[in-house]
């Protein structure tokens, strides 16, 4: 507490519940409170794979175990604290990453695409709010812009759905499809998708009627399984899949786009490409009745995103609208003096395209009837 002039010795066996043979993997001082610190230890060299993770709130005088939610056979390696929200902690373990929203009182497994691997180190890139993971022999992983996690608490996880604040979306024209002429020396990872990244949380899965029936039949494995009936099976075949829907609107409340993904429990994300559907045209000459959709760039400004779910054909609102900005990536250039005129012309062209599509479809149906 005096800049390193004086030290107080503390041995491992002074920590409650920690064997004296345990090895100290990490010690972290709290970024916001000088009396709070965290320590991670392991004793696997002696056949002990328990997680030893402790916290002090009085400068090391007393330590308390904070392993609620971490399985008994999970070694802990590193801990990092968010630099904005003091309650948000990340923990690297032998079997992936865990996250806490209340300073370690409770931990949650945080996989979301991360394989079950040994994560040995963690670092936070503060400028971009990225979480960087180093694994044991399985490369590096980066969680891009985790700032949405700062808005989560244990109580908010009980909500049916949450849509998080998107960051400002920068608008530009991508010119290359992600690769170049590097031949055999081409090694790369995917960049974040172009557009507005929208993250959302869904509390529960909603299983289809077929999935529920199959679960019941599994429980009847040792007995005769009743036949559900042809009508019930037909209804299962035509039942619409459960979906999460993010509706994009402009500030006038006009629907600009709808982003649809399968409804899944936990943290999810969808990417809006900052474009608006131009219109659809039914190709009447095609046996497949192909529907072609064009999309054009939206103008910069304020937009809103709102989360819905569709379960067995019924749509329910899960969140209030959340606003975000769309801006040009280059701000030191001249603006288009005809932007409003271009927008009005595009809207007129969209209406004309829609009318043309409807006319073409009506003509196609009439011609089929005459045949």
Model-derived regions: residue spans:
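Beta-propeller blade termini and top-face loops
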Residues: 1-186, 193-194, 203-205
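Extracytoplasmic/secretory ectodomains and luminal regions
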Residues: 153-371
């Amino acid at each position: 507490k005096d800049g390193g002039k004086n030290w107080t010795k503390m041995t491992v066996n002074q920590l409650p519940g920690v064997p004296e043979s345990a090895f100290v993997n990490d010690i972290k001082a709290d970024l916001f409170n000088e009396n709070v610190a965290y320590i991670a230890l392991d004793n696997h060299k002696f056949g002990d794979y328990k997680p030893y993770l402790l916290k002090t709130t009085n400068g090391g005088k007393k330590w308390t175990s904070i392993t609620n939610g971490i399985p008994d056979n999970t070694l802990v390696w590193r801990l990092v604290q968010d630099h904005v929200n003091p309650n948000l902690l990340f923990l690297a373990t032998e079997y992936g990453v865990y996250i806490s929203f209340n300073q370690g009182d409770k931990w949650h497994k945080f996989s979301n695409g991360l394989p079950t691997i040994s994560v040995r180190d963690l670092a936070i890139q503060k400028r971009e709010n990225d979480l960087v993971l180093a694994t044991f022999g399985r490369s590096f992983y980066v969680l891009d812009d985790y700032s949405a996690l700062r808005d989560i608490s244990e109580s908010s996880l009980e909500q049916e759905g949450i849509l998080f604040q998107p960051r400002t979306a920068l608008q530009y024209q991508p010119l290359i499809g992600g690769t170049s002429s590097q031949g055999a020396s081409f090694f790369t990872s995917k960049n974040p998708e172009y557009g507005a990244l929208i993250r959302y949380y869904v509390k529960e899965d909603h299983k289809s009627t077929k999935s529920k029936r199959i679960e019941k039949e599994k429980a009847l494995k040792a007995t005769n399984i009743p036949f559900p009936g042809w009508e019930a099976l037909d209804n299962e075949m035509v039942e619409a899949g459960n979906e999460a829907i993010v509706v994009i609107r402009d500030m006038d409340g006009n629907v600009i786009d709808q982003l649809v993904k399968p409804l899944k429990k936990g943290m999810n994300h969808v990417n809006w490409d900052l474009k608006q559907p131009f219109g659809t045209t039914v190709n009447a000459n095609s046996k497949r009745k192909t529907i072609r959709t064009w999309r054009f760039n939206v103008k910069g400004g304020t937009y809103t995103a709102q989360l819905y779910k569709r379960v067995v054909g019924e749509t329910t609102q899960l969140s209030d609208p959340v606003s975000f900005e769309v801006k040009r990536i280059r701000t030191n250039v001249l603006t288009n003096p005809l932007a409003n005129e271009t927008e009005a012309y595009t809207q007129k062209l969209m209406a004309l395209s829609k009318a043309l599509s409807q006319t073409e479809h009506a003509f196609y149906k009439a011609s089929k009837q005459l045949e």
